[in-house]
């Protein structure tokens, strides 16, 4: 098959499968069928726990999934990833590594946002989402200008620490729902203020839904009346607007910009 200027062998099929929370009941029928048809199933240790007894399951660190898939002799290889293959997923990097070596199929799964919102009985069509799990970004920036923000958390930006950040910014009153180990037997969902959840320890597999009933308007200009010292503005509004435009900033929901002009 000729794809993007390259000839590739298509006698091998790599199936990247989203497994939702990782619990068997969260697997779609398509995912279960694909696993049953595969000659080899590759998974991290955490996801393989729910596939106990399956002889064709091989566990390895995440960084070795693609390498193990390519070195195997199986014609059909299933690779399990958590969540959905299109939502801040490892599927993207896996596809890039496997495309030149065979056909790559992605099978979607449930996102943690869907799981949490379903448990809370709330829609997610108006939610701004971002991932802070091993990534840089600002929950504060997103929460300041949006009514509802969903965030994947982890590492240095864990759920408890993010709630502390909101408290430090004067947003400790905001309503926050925290989902931990969603779908597992030790699942825990808590709802309270950011200040309340900032005092409650949390593991690494957690997500947040933050609600701000009075978000700011990011596009409102700062006028002279907002910058007066005595009766004289510190700078002219036209100068401030021109200076900010020259910075050529792009609005990113997870980022906050600060300027002194």
Located regions from the model:
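Solvent-exposed alpha-helices and their adjacent loops that cap or buttress functional pockets
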Residues: 9-11, 33-34, 72, 98-99, ...
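Short, glycine-/small-residue-rich phosphate/pyrophosphate-handling segment
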Residues: 112-147, 154
């Amino acid at each position: 098959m000729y794809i993007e200027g390259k000839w590739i062998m298509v006698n091998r099929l790599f199936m990247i499968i989203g497994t939702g929370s990782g619990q068997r009941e969260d697997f779609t029928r398509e995912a279960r069928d694909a696993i049953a048809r595969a000659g080899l199933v590759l998974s991290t240790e955490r996801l393989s726990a729910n596939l106990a007894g399956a002889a064709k399951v091989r566990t390895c660190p995440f960084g070795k999934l693609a390498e193990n898939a390519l070195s195997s002799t199986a014609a059909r290889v299933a690779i399990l990833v958590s969540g959905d293959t299109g939502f801040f997923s490892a599927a993207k990097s896996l596809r890039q590594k496997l495309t030149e070596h065979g056909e790559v199929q992605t099978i979607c799964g449930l996102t943690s946002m869907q799981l949490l919102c379903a448990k809370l009985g709330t829609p997610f069509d108006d939610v701004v989402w971002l991932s802070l799990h091993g990534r840089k970004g600002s929950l504060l920036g997103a929460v300041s200008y949006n009514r509802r923000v969903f965030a994947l958390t982890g590492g240095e930006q864990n759920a408890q620490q993010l709630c502390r950040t909101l408290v430090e910014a004067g947003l400790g009153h905001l309503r926050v729902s925290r989902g931990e180990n969603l779908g597992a037997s030790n699942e825990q969902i808590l709802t309270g203020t950011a200040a309340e959840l900032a005092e409650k320890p949390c593991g690494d597999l957690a997500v947040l839904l933050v609600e701000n009933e009075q978000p700011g308007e990011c596009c409102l200009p700062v006028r002279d009346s907002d910058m007066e010292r005595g009766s004289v503005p510190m700078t002219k509004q036209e100068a401030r607007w021109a200076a900010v435009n020259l910075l050529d900033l792009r609005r990113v929901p997870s980022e906050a910009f600060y300027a002194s002009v």
